[in-house]
Amino acid sequence: MALLSITPLVSRSCLSSSHEIKALRRTIPTLGICRPGKSVAHSINMCLTSVASTDSVQRRVGNYHSNLWDDDFIQSLISTPYGAPDYRERADRLIGEVKDIMFNFKSLEDGGNDLLQRLLLVDDVERLGIDRHFKKEIKTALDYVNSYWNEKGIGCGRESVVTDLNSTALGLRTLRLHGYTVSSDVLNVFKDKNGQFSSTANIQIEGEIRGVLNLFRASLVAFPGEKVMDEAETFSTKYLREALQKIPASSILSLEIRDVLEYGWHTNLPRLEARNYMDVFGQHTKNKNAAEKLLELAKLEFNIFHSLQERELKHVSRWWKDSGSPEMTFCRHRHVEYYALASCIAFEPQHSGFRLGFTKMSHLITVLDDMYDVFGTVDELELFTATIKRWDPSAMECLPEYMKGVYMMVYHTVNEMARVAEKAQGRDTLNYARQAWEACFDSYMQEAKWIATGYLPTFEEYLENGKVSSAHRPCALQPILTLDIPFPDHILKEVDFPSKLNDLICIILRLRGDTRCYKADRARGEEASSISCYMKDNPGLTEEDALNHINFMIRDAIRELNWELLKPDNSVPITSKKHAFDISRVWHHGYRYRDGYSFANVETKSLVMRTVIEPVPL
């Protein structure tokens, strides 16, 4: 990843120059379009409820709530002490102690339990968000487990004569996520004579519950066509929900089950998972001393990164303010939320370029989306699209004033990200990025025309355009290119357009976003959605029928996406694809139950507080 120095503050490599910042700071007193032979000056009221102009331009309104995280509040955050060298030194000592105590596999040579203990240790360090310190040890542990894997799975230890659900389910999930070739057919061993998953009568046996919990977790990394994984998910979901009714609601096991059912895998964010897992970790561990060291290390690492987040967040807020964004009252302002999401999928200290880049790209996309979908007129948008594709600020003089601010923000930010990416990749990627943006502008323009004319496309026509207008590609491309992972053309084409990975992420984002937003969009005059277009193509279907079909499409696409990420013997390493995949988890997280991007709900605010604003108590 491109390394950006954040000491003592974020590197100027991600900041606009002073003359660029001045160019971006614009007020919006007028709205005008230059036309041959006609000079038009519009006076606008930028409150979201009405816009007055001399020719009475009527604009649609998003009715979005304002920015929840004022720049004054962000800049006033008091720095925590965790950036001091002594905290880093303590964390480094603990890393060594954990390796000596917990990853000393000579202490795990009990043939009756050695496989499960290795899997549990790997699972713990991953869920606590500290696995990057133990890559070598994790590989050694998983190689050992894999050497005893067979067509019936594994038992708790290498000498076990009976396969074990907990060990096999956890092993299937963990080995698959690390690129080992393991078949889900091993789960058939745990079916009864009727071919069904079954359990004992006493659902309160904690060991059995944990086995089913890991069966549920394993079912989420299913590949296409794996019927047994579908059956495992159905059985385990029902079982765990029933278990929650029978075990104490305040118990650690209950909290763990609720978290796993709530977030799953595709909607989970690693840093949020780490923060939540700290609250339940260690309660069922026999080696309390070792568990305490592991938990202390996790908390220290969480807070050391938190001290870096404070500086990055202040940079993001300054960038947002200096870019003229506060004057863009027609759009949503979710830059702080986007930074929290970026931090939750990339919390290695050296990935600053990715975090800042994703935050800025997401903000640009949000501004553009609201401008094209809601605020701009078709004439204005056609002019903006043609002008920005020229990539020449001197060509923007005929744009309305509010569009000039948007133009300059996009122009400077994309150029700056290209310079950061060039340092990481050793080549100029600006033209590549511009191609992604131009395709996005065209897709936005197409949707604006549909809105203006009331045209309802076919489902196929809508989805082809919607994959591009989902804007995953420009959001992900430049941040990924800042990574310290080389992306030569042949690798980049397997991660970005026209790869299957990119296509699936865009499909899922478009369809999932539609299922959460189509009613609000329709209320604003946007008729086209995957739901309405599918109903048009299939007369007689109800809205519920269409929603069910779209949800099945999403489910199938997720399975295909799992395969694209994890397929064995792949020429493209998982590490090269993982950040694009994790960005898809960001979108999933925000659309879990509702549109969490347009309207920041309690969960969104809690995410920002728990993963960015507040350190974890030591």
Curated annotation (Swiss-Prot):
Binding site for Mg(2+) 3: 521
Gene Ontology MF terms: camphene synthase activity; magnesium ion binding; terpene synthase activity
Residues annotated to bind Mg(2+) 2: 369, 373
Transit peptide feature, positions: 1-51
UniProt-annotated binding residues for Mg(2+) 1: 369, 373
Motif (DDXXD motif): 369-373
Reactions it catalyzes: (2E)-geranyl diphosphate = (1S,4R)-camphene + diphosphate
Gene Ontology biological-process entries: diterpenoid biosynthetic process
Pathway in which this enzyme or protein is active: Terpene metabolism; oleoresin biosynthesis
Cofactor binding description: Binds 3 Mg(2+) or Mn(2+) ions per subunit.
SUPFAM superfamilies: Terpenoid cyclases/Protein prenyltransferases (SSF48239), Terpenoid synthases (SSF48576)
UniProt keyword Lyase present: yes
UniProt keyword terms in alphabetical order: Chloroplast, Lyase, Magnesium, Manganese, Metal-binding, Plastid, Transit peptide
Top EC class of this enzyme: lyase
Function, in words: Involved in defensive oleoresin formation in conifers in response to insect attack or other injury. Involved in monoterpene (C10) olefins biosynthesis.
Additional remarks: The conserved 59-Arg-Arg-60 motif may play a role in the isomerization step of the terpenoid cyclization reaction sequence.
Sequence similarity: Belongs to the terpene synthase family. Tpsd subfamily.
PANTHER family with a match to the protein in the record: OS04G0344100 PROTEIN-RELATED, TERPENE SYNTHASE 11-RELATED
Name of this protein: Camphene synthase, chloroplastic
Organism: Abies grandis (Grand fir)
UniProt gene name: ag6
